[in-house]
Design a protein with these regions (language model features):
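Signature of Gram-negative chaperone-usher
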Residues: 26-219
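Internal alpha-helical transmembrane segments of multi-pass membrane proteins, especially GPCRs
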Residues: 7-10
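C-terminal segment of classical bacterial N-terminal signal peptides
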Residues: 15-27
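Positively charged n-region of N-terminal signal peptides that target proteins for export
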Residues: 1-5
Protein backbone atom coordinates (compact mmCIF):
# COMPACT_ATOMS: atom_id res chain seq x y z
CA UNK A 1 0.00 0.00 0.00
CA UNK A 2 2.79 2.37 0.95
CA UNK A 3 4.60 1.57 -2.30
CA UNK A 4 1.48 2.48 -4.29
CA UNK A 5 1.15 5.78 -2.45
CA UNK A 6 4.80 6.64 -3.06
CA UNK A 7 4.47 5.71 -6.71
CA UNK A 8 1.36 7.87 -7.05
CA UNK A 9 3.11 10.84 -5.40
CA UNK A 10 6.10 10.39 -7.70
CA UNK A 11 3.86 10.28 -10.77
CA UNK A 12 2.03 13.43 -9.68
CA UNK A 13 5.34 15.26 -9.06
CA UNK A 14 6.66 14.21 -12.45
CA UNK A 15 3.49 15.44 -14.12
CA UNK A 16 3.72 18.77 -12.29
CA UNK A 17 7.40 19.19 -13.22
CA UNK A 18 6.68 18.36 -16.84
CA UNK A 19 3.86 20.91 -16.88
CA UNK A 20 6.19 23.53 -15.44
CA UNK A 21 8.77 22.88 -18.14
CA UNK A 22 6.10 23.30 -20.81
CA UNK A 23 4.51 26.44 -19.39
CA UNK A 24 7.63 28.20 -17.97
CA UNK A 25 8.76 29.86 -21.24
CA UNK A 26 5.41 31.63 -21.55
CA UNK A 27 5.70 32.89 -18.02
CA UNK A 28 9.35 34.02 -18.28
CA UNK A 29 9.27 35.71 -21.73
CA UNK A 30 8.77 39.59 -21.59
CA UNK A 31 6.22 41.54 -23.56
CA UNK A 32 6.68 45.21 -24.39
CA UNK A 33 4.92 48.27 -25.74
CA UNK A 34 6.02 51.82 -26.55
CA UNK A 35 4.56 55.30 -26.79
CA UNK A 36 5.61 58.33 -28.82
CA UNK A 37 6.09 61.50 -26.77
CA UNK A 38 5.44 64.63 -28.84
CA UNK A 39 6.36 68.20 -27.91
CA UNK A 40 5.28 70.96 -30.25
CA UNK A 41 7.58 73.93 -30.92
CA UNK A 42 6.07 77.15 -32.20
CA UNK A 43 7.64 79.52 -34.71
CA UNK A 44 9.12 82.79 -33.48
CA UNK A 45 11.03 85.71 -34.94
CA UNK A 46 13.33 88.35 -33.48
CA UNK A 47 15.08 91.42 -34.89
CA UNK A 48 18.01 93.25 -33.35
CA UNK A 49 18.08 96.89 -32.33
CA UNK A 50 21.24 98.42 -33.82
CA UNK A 51 22.66 101.77 -32.78
CA UNK A 52 21.71 104.92 -34.67
CA UNK A 53 23.65 105.83 -37.81
CA UNK A 54 25.97 108.81 -38.18
CA UNK A 55 26.88 109.55 -41.78
CA UNK A 56 30.53 109.43 -42.81
CA UNK A 57 31.10 113.21 -42.84
CA UNK A 58 29.29 116.52 -42.54
CA UNK A 59 28.06 118.30 -45.67
CA UNK A 60 28.85 121.98 -46.29
CA UNK A 61 25.54 123.80 -46.02
CA UNK A 62 26.03 126.12 -49.01
CA UNK A 63 28.38 124.45 -51.50
CA UNK A 64 27.28 120.93 -50.68
CA UNK A 65 29.08 117.74 -51.66
CA UNK A 66 28.32 117.15 -55.35
CA UNK A 67 29.86 113.94 -56.64
CA UNK A 68 30.92 112.85 -53.16
CA UNK A 69 27.93 111.29 -51.38
CA UNK A 70 28.14 110.76 -47.66
CA UNK A 71 27.55 107.18 -46.58
CA UNK A 72 26.23 105.28 -43.59
CA UNK A 73 24.99 101.78 -42.81
CA UNK A 74 23.25 99.70 -40.21
CA UNK A 75 22.74 95.97 -39.72
CA UNK A 76 19.55 94.33 -38.54
CA UNK A 77 20.00 90.70 -37.44
CA UNK A 78 16.90 88.59 -37.93
CA UNK A 79 16.49 85.18 -36.28
CA UNK A 80 13.58 82.85 -36.95
CA UNK A 81 12.88 79.14 -36.66
CA UNK A 82 9.91 79.47 -39.01
CA UNK A 83 10.17 76.80 -41.72
CA UNK A 84 9.06 79.20 -44.44
CA UNK A 85 11.33 82.07 -43.44
CA UNK A 86 10.50 85.75 -43.23
CA UNK A 87 10.18 89.02 -45.09
CA UNK A 88 11.81 92.27 -44.02
CA UNK A 89 10.46 95.64 -45.04
CA UNK A 90 11.75 99.20 -44.75
CA UNK A 91 9.84 102.44 -44.33
CA UNK A 92 10.35 106.04 -43.25
CA UNK A 93 8.23 107.91 -40.73
CA UNK A 94 8.00 111.07 -42.83
CA UNK A 95 8.08 112.59 -46.31
CA UNK A 96 10.69 113.81 -46.94
CA UNK A 97 12.61 111.43 -44.72
CA UNK A 98 15.73 113.46 -43.86
CA UNK A 99 14.64 116.69 -42.17
CA UNK A 100 15.85 119.41 -39.84
CA UNK A 101 12.51 121.14 -39.39
CA UNK A 102 9.49 122.11 -41.44
CA UNK A 103 11.63 124.20 -43.82
CA UNK A 104 15.01 122.54 -44.27
CA UNK A 105 15.37 118.99 -45.56
CA UNK A 106 16.90 116.56 -48.03
CA UNK A 107 14.52 115.42 -50.72
CA UNK A 108 13.91 111.69 -50.97
CA UNK A 109 16.08 110.15 -53.69
CA UNK A 110 14.44 110.29 -57.13
CA UNK A 111 15.18 107.18 -59.24
CA UNK A 112 14.85 107.38 -63.02
CA UNK A 113 11.88 104.98 -62.95
CA UNK A 114 9.42 105.62 -60.15
CA UNK A 115 9.57 102.96 -57.42
CA UNK A 116 12.39 101.10 -59.19
CA UNK A 117 15.90 101.43 -57.75
CA UNK A 118 18.70 102.96 -59.83
CA UNK A 119 21.63 100.61 -60.36
CA UNK A 120 24.05 103.50 -59.73
CA UNK A 121 23.48 106.45 -57.45
CA UNK A 122 22.26 109.35 -59.55
CA UNK A 123 23.96 112.67 -58.85
CA UNK A 124 21.74 115.33 -57.32
CA UNK A 125 20.70 118.12 -59.67
CA UNK A 126 21.73 121.74 -59.10
CA UNK A 127 20.21 123.14 -55.92
CA UNK A 128 19.01 119.70 -54.81
CA UNK A 129 19.93 117.56 -51.79
CA UNK A 130 18.83 113.91 -51.65
CA UNK A 131 18.72 110.95 -49.26
CA UNK A 132 18.34 107.31 -50.33
CA UNK A 133 19.06 103.73 -49.32
CA UNK A 134 19.83 100.24 -50.57
CA UNK A 135 19.99 96.78 -49.01
CA UNK A 136 22.62 94.04 -48.90
CA UNK A 137 21.27 90.79 -47.42
CA UNK A 138 23.50 88.21 -45.75
CA UNK A 139 22.24 85.69 -48.33
CA UNK A 140 22.04 87.05 -51.87
CA UNK A 141 19.16 84.74 -52.79
CA UNK A 142 17.07 86.36 -50.04
CA UNK A 143 17.17 89.75 -51.78
CA UNK A 144 13.72 90.96 -52.76
CA UNK A 145 13.29 91.02 -56.54
CA UNK A 146 13.16 94.82 -56.55
CA UNK A 147 16.74 95.03 -55.26
CA UNK A 148 18.24 92.23 -57.34
CA UNK A 149 20.37 93.23 -60.32
CA UNK A 150 21.82 91.81 -63.51
CA UNK A 151 25.00 93.87 -63.42
CA UNK A 152 23.50 96.96 -65.02
CA UNK A 153 19.87 97.28 -63.92
CA UNK A 154 17.80 96.58 -60.82
CA UNK A 155 14.56 94.68 -60.47
CA UNK A 156 16.22 92.14 -62.79
CA UNK A 157 18.66 89.26 -62.60
CA UNK A 158 19.72 87.33 -59.50
CA UNK A 159 22.68 89.30 -58.12
CA UNK A 160 23.00 91.80 -55.31
CA UNK A 161 26.05 93.86 -56.18
CA UNK A 162 27.51 96.06 -53.46
CA UNK A 163 26.45 99.71 -53.34
CA UNK A 164 23.88 99.38 -56.11
CA UNK A 165 20.10 99.64 -56.47
CA UNK A 166 19.36 102.95 -54.73
CA UNK A 167 15.81 103.90 -53.84
CA UNK A 168 13.95 106.61 -51.98
CA UNK A 169 12.62 105.82 -48.52
CA UNK A 170 8.82 105.71 -48.40
CA UNK A 171 6.25 105.96 -45.63
CA UNK A 172 4.82 102.72 -47.05
CA UNK A 173 6.60 99.45 -46.27
CA UNK A 174 8.87 98.27 -49.08
CA UNK A 175 9.92 94.61 -49.01
CA UNK A 176 13.72 94.34 -49.16
CA UNK A 177 14.28 90.75 -47.97
CA UNK A 178 12.30 87.59 -48.68
CA UNK A 179 13.74 84.41 -47.18
CA UNK A 180 11.94 81.09 -47.63
CA UNK A 181 13.62 78.98 -44.92
CA UNK A 182 14.50 79.30 -41.26
CA UNK A 183 17.74 81.02 -40.23
CA UNK A 184 20.49 79.52 -38.13
CA UNK A 185 20.57 80.29 -34.42
CA UNK A 186 22.97 83.14 -35.26
CA UNK A 187 20.44 84.70 -37.63
CA UNK A 188 20.89 86.66 -40.85
CA UNK A 189 22.73 90.00 -40.83
CA UNK A 190 20.80 92.28 -43.17
CA UNK A 191 22.71 95.45 -44.10
CA UNK A 192 20.92 98.65 -45.09
CA UNK A 193 23.09 101.40 -46.59
CA UNK A 194 22.26 105.10 -46.78
CA UNK A 195 23.60 107.98 -48.90
CA UNK A 196 23.17 111.75 -48.85
CA UNK A 197 24.27 114.28 -51.44
CA UNK A 198 23.74 118.02 -51.83
CA UNK A 199 24.47 119.91 -55.03
CA UNK A 200 24.75 123.39 -53.58
CA UNK A 201 21.33 123.35 -51.93
CA UNK A 202 21.17 125.91 -49.13
CA UNK A 203 20.83 123.91 -45.92
CA UNK A 204 20.60 125.48 -42.49
CA UNK A 205 23.26 124.26 -40.06
CA UNK A 206 22.15 121.42 -37.81
CA UNK A 207 21.69 117.68 -37.45
CA UNK A 208 19.20 116.42 -40.00
CA UNK A 209 17.52 113.14 -39.17
CA UNK A 210 15.55 110.36 -40.85
CA UNK A 211 13.75 107.68 -38.86
CA UNK A 212 13.87 104.40 -40.76
CA UNK A 213 11.95 101.37 -39.50
CA UNK A 214 12.70 97.75 -40.39
CA UNK A 215 9.96 95.18 -39.83
CA UNK A 216 10.57 91.42 -39.99
CA UNK A 217 7.49 89.23 -40.44
CA UNK A 218 7.28 85.44 -40.67
CA UNK A 219 6.15 84.05 -44.03
Amino acid sequence: MMKRILSLVLIINLMAYTGFLVSEPDIANAVEDSVVVTQGVTAEITISSPIDVTMSADIPGITGNPGSPRTGATTWTVITNNNTGFVMSIKSTSTPSMILDGTYNFSDYSPVAVNVPDYSWGAAGAGVAEFGYTVEPATVADTATLFKDNGSACNAGASNSANTCWLNASTTDVTVINRTTETTSAGEDEIVRFQTESNAKYLKEGNYGATITATATMN
